[in-house]
């Protein structure tokens, strides 16, 4: 239809394009790629459809399907064509397509109508007929090529050519000193050295060749393989490249390049035979940057576990890679530096038992410091921040695990920045729990400030939208007035914990879910054990059913958490417009306290709901990632 429409357009003539026709909501526009056999079957059916009682049919099964076209001869048979569904944007990310239909108006004028945006593509798979036809064409082409290149000329025939006598060049006078016969001066030592160098590199272990190339610069896998093949690679080593890269290199998800892991730099040899003098100088610079700062990093880490944003931007300890890069514009943000002097050193991310008391007193920061969000299950550490986006026929539905609606399972605003309600409440509950904890209790995980946990999220901190600025205001709410009632709230929380559990340690465990992580709680979440890689369509359907079963609950919890956060955002915006110390300013403070108490009474299970919401977020994102990986594997297997 598209080809016919294009053929009907005339040069030097204008056409009007009508978009957004009414009544077209039930039409899905697809880009169909047919084989020659399928086209011939459709054309045959079109020419004999009045004589054939059956009609063509198409059936979708996930990302695959079956197309049935009736035959004219034999009469009652059909031709089956398998096909698979893919996303047009993934195959051609630089362009997009609209489906245009050419029609004739009542006046006879030609006009164009836009039927919709093409998002999905159907590719019909080749059949045995297609393979047989290709084989016959190849045989015919070979025969024609052979006939053109070979001609038998019989003696006395019409194709006998003229004989051409070729004069021999006169022999040159022999030189009395044959050693002088050298057209250009050559140094054979260079040639021997090059040959020896190439051969010696190809004889080295494949792993050593990989790490010595990655030590100089980052390579993408195809580039690295092409570079290795210059020196010679056998098939066995070529197949083991992926396993070696997983062992010795880190993958940069932005450009899919590989960089050498830090511990492998100790294995490098400066006199590697494949290195030129320039390569050795480059290696010296890399090694001096990698090995020497590691000592400085260890000493500075023992002195101060948290570095300010200024140090993070200028310190050479950080690897100069995209994964650890911190924007220099972060220098002006002083929120981390307030916490630097107030958090005690940690050992592997945990507080020493002797440091618990000091950390307990440090949890409520002063007004100038940022309030770290204590998240029981931080969704920002999802293994799938951007799951594979595969598309099927309902690709516009965000509530399906294979849909494109990644806005439903992103890093949520309430879990990324934290709500002020949680900050205000945990300010007291965490301190109360830590102070009542005996020295011999479980290890405590010291909460890291949000700026250190997520440095990448602040790359564009100076270009924040108004919405992001409002979210940051949550963390900057002044709590001077709250400290006046600290003792009352402390006693209230202590009494609440005592009533909730007869055992003080159990009460601490229940009330401090956000700030405590016992060593026994380091087990994997249940969904990581239950939901493993998908190997069948039945397993995929079960995962999809589980996703849909809990999706509504997740959305409801998410909406409740966001509602709580927005109340305090609004109050904080009012407070910022007032001058400190004024009566209106104090009134807003009182309103914040009242709202805090109101939320606390109306939502006594706030922490449990937030934990459940973040648990569902991680679980659904995990399921969505598995389904996306399975769909991507199936689509690649059809290509």
UniProtKB/Swiss-Prot annotation:
**Does Transcription regulation show up as a keyword for this record?**
yes
Which residues are annotated with the PTM Phosphoserine? 501, 579
- Stretches with biased composition (Basic and acidic residues): 470-479
Q: Does the keyword ATP-binding apply?
A: no
Pfam families noted in UniProt: ELL, Occludin_ELL
Q: Name one GO biological process term.
A: snRNA transcription by RNA polymerase II
- The superkingdom listed in its UniProt entry is Eukaryota
What modifications follow translation? Ubiquitinated by SIAH1, leading to its degradation by the proteasome. Interaction with AFF4 stabilizes ELL2 and prevents ELL2 ubiquitination.
* Region named Disordered: 175-203, 291-326, 378-416, 439-513
Per UniProt, the ranges with Low complexity bias are: 378-401
Q: Where is the composition biased (Acidic residues)?
A: 480-490
Q: Where in the cell is it found?
A: Nucleus
Q: Where is the composition biased (Polar residues)?
A: 291-317
Keyword entries, A-Z:
Nucleus, Phosphoprotein, Transcription, Transcription regulation, Ubl conjugation
Cellular component terms per the entry's GO annotation: transcription elongation factor complex
User: What quaternary arrangement does the UniProt entry report?
Assistant: Component of the super elongation complex (SEC), at least composed of EAF1, EAF2, CDK9, MLLT3/AF9, AFF (AFF1 or AFF4), the P-TEFb complex and ELL (ELL, ELL2 or ELL3). Component of the little elongation complex (LEC), at least composed of ELL (ELL, ELL2 or ELL3), ZC3H8, ICE1 and ICE2. Interacts with AFF4; the interaction is direct and leads to stabilize ELL2 and prevent ELL2 ubiquitination. Interacts with EAF1 and EAF2.
Give the record's family classification.
Answer: Belongs to the ELL/occludin family.
Instruction: Return the protein name.
Output: RNA polymerase II elongation factor ELL2
* Organism from which the protein derives: Mus musculus (Mouse)
Q: Which gene encodes it?
A: Ell2
């Amino acid at each position: 239809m598209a080809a016919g429409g294009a053929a009907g357009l005339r040069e030097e003539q204008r056409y009007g394009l009508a978009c957004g026709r009414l009544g077209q909501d039930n039409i899905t526009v697809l880009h169909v790629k047919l084989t020659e056999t399928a086209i011939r079957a459709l054309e045959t059916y079109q020419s004999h459809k009045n004589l054939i009682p059956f009609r063509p049919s198409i059936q979708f099964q996930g990302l695959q399907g079956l197309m049935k076209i009736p035959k004219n001869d034999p009469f009652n048979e059909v031709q089956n064509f398998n096909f698979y569904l893919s996303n047009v944007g993934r195959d051609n990310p630089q362009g997009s397509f609209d489906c245009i239909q050419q029609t004739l108006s009542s006046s006879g004028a030609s006009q164009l109508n836009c039927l919709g945006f093409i998002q999905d593509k159907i590719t019909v798979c080749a059949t045995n007929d297609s393979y047989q036809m290709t084989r016959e064409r190849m045989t015919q082409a070979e025969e024609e090529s052979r006939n053109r290149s070979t001609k038998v000329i019989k003696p006395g025939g019409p194709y006998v050519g003229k004989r051409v006598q070729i004069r021999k060049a006169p022999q040159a006078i022999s030189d009395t000193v044959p050693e002088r016969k050298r057209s250009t001066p050559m140094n054979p030592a260079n040639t021997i050295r090059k040959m020896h160098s190439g051969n010696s590199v190809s004889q080295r272990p494949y792993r050593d060749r990989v790490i010595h190339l990655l030590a100089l610069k980052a390579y993408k896998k195809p580039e690295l393989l092409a570079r290795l093949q210059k020196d010679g690679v056998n098939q066995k080593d070529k197949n083991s490249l992926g396993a070696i890269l997983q062992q010795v290199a880190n993958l940069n998800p932005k450009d899919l390049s590989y960089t050498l892991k830090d511990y492998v730099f100790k294995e490098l040899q400066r006199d590697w035979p494949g290195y030129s003098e320039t390569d050795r100088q480059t290696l010296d610079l890399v090694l001096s940057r990698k090995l020497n700062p590691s000592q400085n990093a260890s000493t500075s880490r023992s002195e101060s576990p948290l570095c300010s944003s200024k140090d993070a931007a200028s310190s050479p300890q950080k690897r100069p890679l995209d994964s650890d890069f911190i924007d220099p514009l972060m220098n002006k943000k002083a929120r981390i530096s307030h916490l630097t002097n107030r958090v005690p050193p940690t050992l592997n991310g945990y507080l020493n038992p002797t440091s618990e008391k000091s950390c307990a007193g440090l949890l409520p920061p002063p007004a100038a410091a940022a309030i770290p969000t204590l998240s029981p299950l931080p969704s920002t550490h999802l293994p799938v921040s951007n799951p594979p986006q595969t598309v099927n026929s309902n690709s516009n539905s965000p509530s399906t695990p294979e849909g494109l609606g990644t806005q439903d399972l992103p890093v949520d605003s309430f879990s990324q920045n934290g709500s002020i309600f949680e900050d205000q409440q945990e300010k007291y509950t965490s301190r109360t729990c830590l102070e009542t904890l005996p020295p011999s209790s479980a290890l405590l995980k010291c909460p890291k400030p949000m700026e250190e946990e997520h440095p990448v999220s602040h790359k564009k901190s100076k270009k924040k939208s108004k919405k992001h600025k409002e979210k940051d205001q949550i963390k900057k709410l002044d709590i001077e007035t709250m400290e006046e009632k600290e003792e009352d709230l402390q006693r209230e929380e202590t009494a609440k914990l005592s009533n909730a559990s007869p055992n003080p340690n159990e009460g601490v465990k229940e009330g401090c879910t956000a700030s405590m992580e016992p060593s026994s709680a380091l087990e994997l979440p249940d969904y990581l054990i239950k939901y493993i890689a998908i190997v069948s369509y039945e397993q995929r359907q079960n995962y999809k059913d589980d996703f849909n079963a809990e999706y509504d609950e997740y959305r409801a919890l998410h909406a409740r958490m966001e509602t709580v956060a927005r109340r305090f955002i609004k109050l904080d915006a009012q407070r910022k417009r007032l001058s400190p110390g004024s009566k209106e300013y104090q009134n807003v403070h009182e309103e914040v306290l009242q709202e805090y108490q109101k939320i606390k009474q109306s939502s006594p299970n706030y922490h449990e709901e937030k934990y459940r919401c973040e648990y569902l977020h991680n679980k659904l994102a995990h399921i969505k990632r598995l389904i996306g990986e399975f769909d991507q594997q199936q689509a690649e297997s059809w290509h």
